[in-house]
Amino acid sequence: MYARLDKDRLLVEVGQGRLVRRKLLLKWGTLAAAVIAGFVYLASFLWFAPGGEVENLNLVTQENREASMLVTTLEDGSVVYLAQESTLQYPEHFATDKREVNLQGEAFFDVAKNHEQTFLIETGKVRIEVLGTAFNVRSHEDDSFRLSVQRGRVKVSLKQGGQSVLVNAGETVTLQARQLQLSETGDSDEFRQYTKNIRFKDECLEDILRVVNAEAPTLQIQAASSVLNRRKLTIEFENNSPETVAELICWALSLKCSREGDKLILSE
């Protein structure tokens, strides 16, 4: 397998645990995978909560400078696809009553449902509140703002002026002349761009497989044990079939792959 992958110039080894980079334009629905981007650092910051309270939390900062989407699974199971030239900041552990993150730039959020823990996104001029849904956000320093909802419902509020709107699936809200404007989403396929070229940086195999499998329901990839699921991996996929994804993961982690019906099983 190595000889074939190496011949096609699909592998790059980096340090211990191989960094696998593949650029095959194989048609496979909406899935594409990619890795190696942005950097992550963990530090202690002052978190300014609504109401003026200050909390001292360990915040993680994800910064993406690459063209492909940087995919991160948060503590609650929510998945964030961070676009190029964008930054996401969130606490290492969420508070008991809320899940609050800060976004500068563009991202697609697939938020895990939890009615007891509201999910909040702080941007420059707008605050976004959700319980469980999927949507994209574009918020830039030039005051431009745009949010489209794929499923569920989102509440968007201006920080100055107090205007709020509820955005349902199939709707888009923009900020124009300091007012939130609601309209129908023009391109229903705009969400596909976030899953076509994705990468993972130091993510658990379990979280990687959850994202990958969501794009290929007819052929699922599974780890044979919980120990394997906890293995961390930096890897990139780009328009790869499930078989190729499994093959690349096996190469990166020195695993074996076997097929059992509609499942690809990864084992040591």
Locations of the language-model features?
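A residue-level detector for the "anchor" residue at the start of short, highly conserved motifs
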Residues: 12-17, 22-31, 38-268
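Intrinsically disordered Ser/Thr phosphorylation hotspots
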Residues: 1, 31-33
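A short, acidic loop/turn at secondary-structure junctions
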Residues: 1-13
